[in-house]
Amino acid sequence: MAAAMVSSAGGLLAMLNEPHPSLKLHALSYLIRLVDQFWPEISTSVPIIESLYEDEEFDQHQRQLAALLASKVFYYLGELNDSLSYALGAGSLFDVSEDSDYIHTLLSKAIDEYAILRSKAVESSEVVEIDPRLVAIVERMLDKCITDGKYQQAMGIAIECRRLDKLEEAIIKSENVQGTLSYCINVSHSFVNQREYRHEVLRLLVNVYQKLASPDYLSICQCLMFLDEPQGVASILEKLLRSENKDDALLAFQISFDLVQNEHQAFLMSVRDRLPAPKTRPVEAIQAVETSTAQNENTAGDVQMADETPSQTIVHETDPVDAVYAERLTKAKGILSGETSIQLTLQFLYSHNKSDLLILKTIKQSVEMRNSVCHSATIYANAIMHAGTTVDTFLRENLDWLSRATNWAKFSATAGLGVIHRGHLQQGRSLMAPYLPQGGAGGGGSPYSEGGALYALGLIHANHGEGIKQFLRDSLRSTSVEVIQHGACLGLGLAALGTADEDIYDDIKSVLYTDSAVAGEAAGISMGLLLVGTATDKASEMLAYAHETQHEKIIRGLALGIALTVYGREEGADTLIEQMTRDQDPIIRYGGMYALALAYSGTANNKAIRQLLHFAVSDVSDDVRRTAVLALGFVLYSDPEQTPRIVSLLSESYNPHVRYGAALAVGISCAGTGLSEAISLLEPLTSDVVDFVRQGALIAMAMVMVQISEASDSRVGAFRRQLEKIILDKHEDTMSKMGAILASGILDAGGRNVTIRLLSKTKHDKVTAVIGLTVFSQFWYWYPLIYFISLAFSPTAFIGLNYDLKVPKFEFMSHAKPSLFEYPKPTTVATANTAAKLPTAVLSTSAKAKAKAKKEAEQKAKAENSGNEAGKANAASDEKEAESMQVDSTATTVEKKVEPEATFEILVNPARVVPSQEKYIKLMEDSRYVPMKLAPSGFVLLRDLRPHEPEVLSLTDAPTSTASPAVGAEAAGQAQQAATTSAMAIDDEPQPPQAFEYASP
């Protein structure tokens, strides 16, 4: 109470000058309590307080009191550095558990200071001394967090301060270690900017996981993939595959599918090759495995497995354990090679194809034949719309129209088949046989269709080119025609994506050095595709040639190729990025923007964002500025909500190139999300005054809205109508019309069963998808590169698999209204001669007669009112019957309207599950199958709880659904084609497509 009556600290301050130590101690003790109120007055005596702290004759406690008082005064004065310095001197009197602004502020300052010093100590070779008192404060704070059960806070501080020992302590002491580890993995991906340090954190997490009684092998293998340690993954898979427990084998298959989702092909091949072959087995066992694998459709993986297993002399004693391991190993290798998932995806897209051919027919009819840009755009849209479905009905039905494509349009038309048949690994070459170079170069066919066919082969085998690489190399070597070289280079780059094959590199380099502009551009891009993410020294060789050549096309191809080589290298690419962004040639600087985007792709790194924003507003070249803004989309796709906010001002720029870049940046980073802010930003750009800005905005809007239904966002329906209006408008400029046609294809991509996804479920970059969108964005200069968007397509499917990797039928539930996620309704033909329903004409004489009859009926009813009840009832029923006859149709309509929509939907495996639907997916309680991991989509291994009951399988070899759904009046014409296609088994050897008969130009 006495303290509340004090009006000045003057008396206590005077006591500080007293000679007796006990008086000084008394003064300090009371000033500490009053400092919050009287700090302005106390601040005049700071020198005295400081001298007391420095006086060695004082005992430790008194000096610490003086330090704490000085710290608080400096805090109120805003001198945080001095305040922290004296707080360190206060020792244990600085109580980290106190709940006050002073403590919170200084703790934040201390942690920041400590984190900076720790980072500097690691990053620089110099020895950085850290005040042990600062270390003590941070450690006290960490210990307090762990003691209080604030484990996430402790982990955040430990990661920021690079205290991995404290991080491990926080994880181990937490109540839910598995949940804490998952949180820590997410934090390391989201907030740890430095690649090397992130790897240290992940390595620690792997060690903690492995010490657990029941390790989470799914998470361990994901961490090992981030660390690029294939041997660790192979060891875990071998252990699970050799286990006697069937569930462990299912877990191994699930891990393999999860790794394949990340599309890191070189890593997967390394894991596959490290899996040890079974020990010597009898011939009978080998035959059994081969029979089993033939049923599993993993032909390429199986052949390798059979080759690797040497044929021994017949052993009389069969080792059943090894036989089981051999069978499981074959399945695992088939999954890791990607063939199993590709085959299942192909069958799913084929059997669930819901593409609307009437949309394409409308586009075709509205496009003027002499407008080659829109003609080609229609071919692109068809390929994208049917990507991976193997349905080429539209092309077959319009051969005359298609044959009008000449030169590069012919190249694109043929290459489009590669997108339609993407993943058809077994029959890819036979499908393209009619268009491929026959008997070496100049075999008599059109070089444009031959080049397009080689490009198509690359698209079919993208990232899985083992079986086609040699053929593409031979085709490249045996021709000197630049168009064929162009197609062969692109195809080879796709087939050998990220393999860094020296022989292929030399073949492509020899094409580059011919200095042909057309072939050289493709060669530059192809080199980048081949060397994706290798950060190789060859980049400097490519850069040197880019400076030597005079062809802009070659420089641009090389600039993009160099950018591809530094994919995912983060700070390791800074030297090359600096070199490219400072170059005098704007095309090299343009490549530097892509290098910056790809090196930091998906990291949301602040340094990269700052650099890109700087170039977006300061570079003298419009191309560089446009690309700098576009590149933001690649850096930010892991945090799509940020992109519209960051580029919102740029989308209102006076420069149309910057506006275009802003549109595509949003399209890339928010693809498939249906994000409301993204749509709001793009809407005004779709009606921009500049044609190419409208084009970019329409394409970006389609990318954002893919797999979003009109029921979940009404703007989707409005956008579809806007596209139709632009396409049908004869006065619309070509650029906008092309954008609208492409947008129509992207909206309904892959038979309306795919979305664009750049991150896998485990937050790993999908390499192929990111590279695909990067090269797709080059269509500004070269339209055939539009097809690269197909690499970013990811099926929106739940595909449950049993132990035999077959798809059993079982039901699960979507706890949401079916209309929210249903397919778009098929378009209908608008008939002009539909008779409008008009009111019936009534003559005046008829009206008078009806009125008179009604009046007589009323009088008669009154007269008979006293009559018997039966007669009354009959009259009433007759009247009711008459009324019901008149309003029969109306009543039926009302009944239909009244019926409420179901609040859930039963789905059958395999089912279409769009990203926004995943949170509503629930399994039935009495289900026969239980998933190995709770995943609402993708490939999910199922444990059979009733293995003795017979199974009903889905996705059989010959899907019963029609390959090309007929729409409206086209049904009769398509029936025969559809029946033929549906009867054809995907795995059977199909007849090659009919050759397109092009009219000679």
UniProtKB/Swiss-Prot annotation:
Residues modified as Phosphoserine: S889
One example GO MF annotation: enzyme regulator activity
Function field: Acts as a regulatory subunit of the 26 proteasome which is involved in the ATP-dependent degradation of ubiquitinated proteins.
Location in chain, cross-link Glycyl lysine isopeptide (Lys-Gly) (interchain with G-Cter in ubiquitin): K166
CC per GO annotation: extracellular region; nucleus; proteasome complex
Family label: Belongs to the proteasome subunit S1 family.
Keywords: Acetylation, Isopeptide bond, Phosphoprotein, Proteasome, Repeat, Ubl conjugation
Gene: RPN2B
Modified residues (N-acetylalanine): A2
InterPro entries: 26S_Psome_Rpn2, ARM-like, ARM-type_fold, Proteasome/cyclosome_rpt, PSMD1_RPN2_N, RPN2_C
Location of the region described as Disordered in the Swiss-Prot/TrEMBL record: 853-896, 954-1001
Protein name in the entry: 26S proteasome non-ATPase regulatory subunit 1 homolog B
Gene3D superfamilies listed in its UniProt record: Leucine-rich Repeat Variant
Single biological process term from Gene Ontology: protein catabolic process
Quaternary structure, from the entry: Component of the 19S regulatory particle (RP/PA700) base subcomplex of the 26S proteasome. The 26S proteasome is composed of a core protease (CP), known as the 20S proteasome, capped at one or both ends by the 19S regulatory particle (RP/PA700). The RP/PA700 complex is composed of at least 17 different subunits in two subcomplexes, the base and the lid, which form the portions proximal and distal to the 20S proteolytic core, respectively.
Biased composition, class Low complexity, residue ranges: 961-985
Basic and acidic residues composition bias: residue spans: 854-863
